Amino acid sequence: MASEPLALDIEKEPSGPLFLAIADAITRDIMRGRLKPGARLPGTRALARALGVHRNTVDAAYQELMTQGWLHAEPARGTFVAEDLPESMAEPVSVSVPREPATVRPHLAFSDGAPDPRLVPDKALARAFRRALLSPAFRGGADYGDARGTPVLRHALSSYLASDRGVVADPARLLITRGSQMALFLAARAAVKPGQAIAVEEPGYPLAWEAFRAAGASVRGIPVDAGGLSVAALEAAIESDPRIAAVYVTPHHQYPTTVTMGAARRLKLLDTVERHGITLIEDDYDHEYRFEGRPVLPLAARAPAGLPLIYVGSLSKLLSPGIRLGYAMAPEPLLTRMAAARAAIDRQGDAPLEAALADLIRDGDLGRHARKARRIYRARRDVLASALSAHLGGRIFFDRPAGGLALWLHCENVSADAWAERAGVAGLALLPGTHFALDRAAPQALRLGYAALDEGQIARAVDILARSLPD
Amino acid sequence: MASEPLALDIEKEPSGPLFLAIADAITRDIMRGRLKPGARLPGTRALARALGVHRNTVDAAYQELMTQGWLHAEPARGTFVAEDLPESMAEPVSVSVPREPATVRPHLAFSDGAPDPRLVPDKALARAFRRALLSPAFRGGADYGDARGTPVLRHALSSYLASDRGVVADPARLLITRGSQMALFLAARAAVKPGQAIAVEEPGYPLAWEAFRAAGASVRGIPVDAGGLSVAALEAAIESDPRIAAVYVTPHHQYPTTVTMGAARRLKLLDTVERHGITLIEDDYDHEYRFEGRPVLPLAARAPAGLPLIYVGSLSKLLSPGIRLGYAMAPEPLLTRMAAARAAIDRQGDAPLEAALADLIRDGDLGRHARKARRIYRARRDVLASALSAHLGGRIFFDRPAGGLALWLHCENVSADAWAERAGVAGLALLPGTHFALDRAAPQALRLGYAALDEGQIARAVDILARSLPD
């Protein structure tokens, strides 16, 4: 049972905390295969002596790796490399040592448009969560049981939507969910009978299609052009296919192309939906991230009263993908059906998280965070756009997105798949158009979700992008 | 816009904090209708002056009531009684002022078996949550995306189940869910095709039936006797109804009757399930709460390898209904199907909560809490059993439950519904047998979930119970 000696290759002058450099060295050894799943690590005392560091430093490194799932401890037996390594093993972006040693290839990823969790107002959130847990309301179990979510958050969200987006949302018509994914699933359950279809944008958001299919609906792609969903094509589809009972749109920043649906087309869409009596599902997933021009209000802010419109939003894009909080606004009886289905699959909301986020909204922390994040992401967008023009101008084209956390890169004369493959080998993960295709041919394009990369990472990523452009 | 003067009837010598006494007085005025929804409250300064207390005290009372959803603040306008009063309005158990003024009737409730959220190790939980939010793993977004849940919690849970229950659960076969409700929904989605049926205990757990129906399955009741689910009746049902594809059981403490399934019947159940090739869904919802005799290991601890058994558990019963964390263990490919459905309806788990609970398990806080809670609940059970015998002996009978958070009270010669109605008028909420009935006649019985009531509250509740016994 004696463990192997562990000769770690730790950076001599790590740019971050020493414990992270140790954690990073161990992670590298696991990735290289020098430390196998199940292998036992030396005790913290022994390793500290071997490395000439304080035992607490080694302990912090082990704790960090346990939190990340690389190691696990067995009481009275020791610390072992996890048998079941985290999914992120292939993408160790989480090891936050900014300078990589020469032996390890830089590993970067353009996401599908995730925010930067490093910006999360974590101290304010931790404080708010603590307040929520220690509050008499939580200890008294007061919020047990409303499938629509904690009243206090529905009230706070109602004010937020009214002041920020012109959406008048009666708290009684709001449903808090676990991220917008659940809101989309519940919307489809409430709006569509099994066997019916939902018209969706193509290219579009595959996770929404999964939610709709899980709810028993089929999905039918409607083409997207430079103005967003083609309402003429939608109209034709509805007339030819009586199964279409709803349409799903991302008018603010179309996913994945980032285009904004213009005012005239918005009115035409509302009119089409109303005439055909179908449900409109509006996903306003990153409303806060508008950098240019006047804010575009959601369809929900100007839809005629009585239109069956389900408005879906998320706080995950605003904070971190790890904060699971979405919401939906819908008229009765759609909301009642959604709440009933939510109770059946999830009983009730998450009282402490909901109370904590209500606090952040009420105290203004969320608004402050949104302003700060908007400033940072806007700068990152500009860095990305400049670097792309400088390195790839002429070979590719793109519109600098007016908002959102991603840029849509057209590359008509290049295979986006081949490009993504070559970039992957060079250490940069990319999402080509095939990722967003339903039935039609995939666009030769890449979605570059840049927000989680800092400016140095963006520069390196564009460098790899340029070097791996297929001939 | 001037607000009405507010003449509050505050207890002169409140037994709790003064701010809670003020909050309580305001709540009473709302409930009495003296303060209407939408009414404006005086400013904190004015009210503090009127009451002769410090302004912070009034502020704390308002904050408390906003957290509970009774009031809401509008920036620059003032504080108002919520238009949309919390569901708990009819049951202000959350207002934790122990001594009620004579004008207000004591309001108590026997639950369906919820734990006491006042016992939650909230400080340890707040600390663990803070650590999780501030950890590099969370800020790095490392845990994004595994639909089975955070690896570190699956590892911690695996050790916990092995040491505590003899259940050998490979972390790769564990799925973390939002409470056991979602685990039950996903179990039915994975095990049963739409149109097929799940055999369930009757009387039984209506929320499980809702989850199964939401997954497209019908439910078929199998009678329960003093030894739990009748396996002979199950066998007959399977033979007569080929739609039955799964059976749902609560063998440890049958819900709602609290009886434990004996060893011989357990073996017979496993044998029946195996011979007919149906899936076994075992809900071990309150394993930790065994007061008497040797611990009874779950079916999952002794099921033959390869049996399609889905084992479902929850940390909500151990901590608080407000902490939404359940889990399921299942063999491949059931687990893969469950994880895929979970991704479609909820994308991913709750990284901070999962990391925080992994911490509580690893540090031993969860085990310490379980031991403490077990001691307290056992004492409460004894107080309840003694009070029932003293006040109602001869009219009713019950077995002192060996475990669990509820007691099943038989009252064959009394209408349980009439009893519940009379007790309700006197201020005690009760759950009669009708609440747990599917197709068969409801048992004349009451489920007394006592765990959330302290000993004084139990005494008062039994007093009301005795006084409202129908003739």
State each model region's role.
Chain A
Residues 1-133, 137, 142, 146, ...:
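N-terminal basic, amphipathic alpha-helical segments
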Residues 76, 302-337:
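Active-site PLP attachment segment
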Residues 207-210, 276, 280, 290, ...:
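A generic "structured core" feature
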Residues 115, 251-255, 317:
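Short glycine-rich anion-binding loops that position phosphate/pyrophosphate groups of nucleotides
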